[in-house]
């Protein structure tokens, strides 16, 4: 039986594509393994998926671009993770390793290359993260979401592989209940802050609940169960799974962070959106670059977190609603999306 090892973690964005691909390989008779951190979100997501995947936990260390005494300890953690991954590779003898990035992926990638296992990696952002910059040196091939990343010799631009489609789904009962609290004459705004929510969105909704719900139906994915609420023109919930796409379909506009997975999902369904990227003080600036790219393409509006107020947000929302057809036409004309089936066939071809 052919074997494939997946790796990637730290955030949901570093796991999502793996979760989409693994069932395909299982259906085709592959034995699927995953290397990650049992304390990480990658382990939680695999357990929730119920997939027949063998999980191997290794030591991990965070990769930092700045000086920290913690770096010294993490060097040893990464080194031990490489040794652990090497033993896993030598024991399994897989046909390939597929990495979605994140600091947990570096030891398996290095170990795979050392043991002669072909390495395929995927980069979602406009500029590579530190983990993928290291992994690229050991990779057989890298697939990129953005065109600008394709100047490197081992990179193939494939566009975004998204988990949503523009196909309408039957409304779940929970959504019907939510809509009974909404005013259908008002536009619906969905705040999405990633897997852990976004405090800045939560605070904005909390501080301006009255003004917002007078003008919009508000859906706020908070990441914080203490904020859960269903009231007139307002639905706040910490986390959703099956309800995620129906909520996207219900929304007229989405206010989101600038993670590549989320904004390309919105592009796939031509959904109006305002991107409020994480600033450079909280990230390496990849979300700012992603947002600027989408604005340049005419897909979205952006708003820096430092400039986010009720007035500035309403200005962006009003502009999008007034120019809805223009934005949607540009999104629908985009050639930057690839279906899961097409990407899977491409990957299998490269593995052969």
From Swiss-Prot:
Reaction(s) this enzyme catalyzes, per UniProt: Mur2Ac(oyl-L-Ala-gamma-D-Glu-L-Lys-D-Ala-D-Ala)-di-trans,octa-cis-undecaprenyl diphosphate + UDP-N-acetyl-alpha-D-glucosamine = beta-D-GlcNAc-(1->4)-Mur2Ac(oyl-L-Ala-gamma-D-Glu-L-Lys-D-Ala-D-Ala)-di-trans,octa-cis-undecaprenyl diphosphate + UDP + H(+)
Main location: membrane
GO terms under cellular component: plasma membrane
Localization in the cell: Cell membrane
Pathway(s) per entry: Cell wall biogenesis; peptidoglycan biosynthesis
Enzyme's top EC category: transferase
Pfam entry (one): Glyco_tran_28_C
Gene Ontology biological process: carbohydrate metabolic process; cell division; cell wall organization; lipid glycosylation; peptidoglycan biosynthetic process; regulation of cell shape
Binding site for UDP-N-acetyl-alpha-D-glucosamine: 195, 287
Keywords: Cell cycle, Cell division, Cell membrane, Cell shape, Cell wall biogenesis/degradation, Glycosyltransferase, Membrane, Peptidoglycan synthesis, Transferase
InterPro entries hit by this protein: GlcNAc_MurG, Glyco_trans_28_C, GlycoTrans_28_N
Residues that span the membrane, as ranges: none
Example of a GO MF term: undecaprenyldiphospho-muramoylpentapeptide beta-N-acetylglucosaminyltransferase activity
EC number: 2.4.1.227
Membrane topology: Peripheral membrane protein
Family of this protein: Belongs to the glycosyltransferase 28 family. MurG subfamily.
Task of the protein: Cell wall formation. Catalyzes the transfer of a GlcNAc subunit on undecaprenyl-pyrophosphoryl-MurNAc-pentapeptide (lipid intermediate I) to form undecaprenyl-pyrophosphoryl-MurNAc-(pentapeptide)GlcNAc (lipid intermediate II).
Protein name: UDP-N-acetylglucosamine--N-acetylmuramyl-(pentapeptide) pyrophosphoryl-undecaprenol N-acetylglucosamine transferase
Species in which this protein is naturally found: Streptococcus pneumoniae (strain JJA)
Gene of this entry: murG
């Amino acid at each position: 039986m052919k074997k494939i090892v997946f790796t990637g973690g730290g955030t949901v964005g570093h796991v999502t594509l793996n979760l989409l691909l693994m069932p395909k390989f299982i259906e085709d008779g592959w034995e699927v393994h995953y290397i990650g951190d049992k304390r990480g979100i990658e382990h939680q997501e695999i357990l929730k998926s119920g997939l027949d995947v063998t999980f191997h936990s290794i030591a991990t260390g965070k990769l930092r671009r700045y000086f920290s005494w913690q770096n010294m300890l993490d060097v040893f953690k990464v080194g031990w993770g490489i040794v652990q991954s090497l033993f896993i590779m030598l024991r399994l003898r897989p046909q390939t390793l597929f990495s979605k990035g994140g600091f947990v992926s570096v030891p398996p990638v290095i170990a795979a290359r050392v043991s002669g296992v072909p390495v395929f990696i995927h980069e979602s952002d406009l500029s590579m993260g530190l983990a993928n910059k290291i992994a690229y040196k050991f990779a057989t091939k890298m697939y990129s979401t953005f065109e600008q990343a394709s100047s490197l010799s081992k990179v193939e631009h494939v566009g975004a592989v998204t988990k949503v489609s523009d196909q309408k789904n039957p409304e779940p009962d929970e959504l019907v209940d939510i809509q009974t609290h909404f005013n259908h004459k008002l536009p619906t705004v969905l705040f999405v802050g990633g897997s852990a929510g976004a405090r800045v969105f939560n605070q904005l909704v909390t501080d301006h609940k009255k003004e917002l719900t007078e003008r919009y139906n508000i859906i706020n994915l908070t990441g914080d169960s203490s904020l859960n609420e269903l009231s007139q023109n307002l639905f706040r919930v910490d986390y959703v799974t099956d309800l995620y796409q129906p909520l996207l379909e219900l929304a007229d506009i989405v206010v989101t962070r600038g993670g590549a997975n989320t904004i390309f999902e919105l592009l796939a369904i031509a959904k109006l959106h305002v991107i409020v990227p994480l600033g450079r003080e909280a990230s390496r600036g990849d979300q700012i670059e992603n947002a600027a790219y989408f604005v340049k393409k005419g897909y979205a509006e952006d708003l820096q977190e430092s400039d986010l107020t009720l007035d500035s947000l309403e200005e962006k929302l009003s502009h999008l609603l007034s120019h809805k057809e223009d934005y949607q036409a540009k999104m629908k004309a985009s050639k930057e999306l690839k279906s899961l089936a097409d990407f899977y066939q491409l990957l299998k071809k490269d593995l052969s």
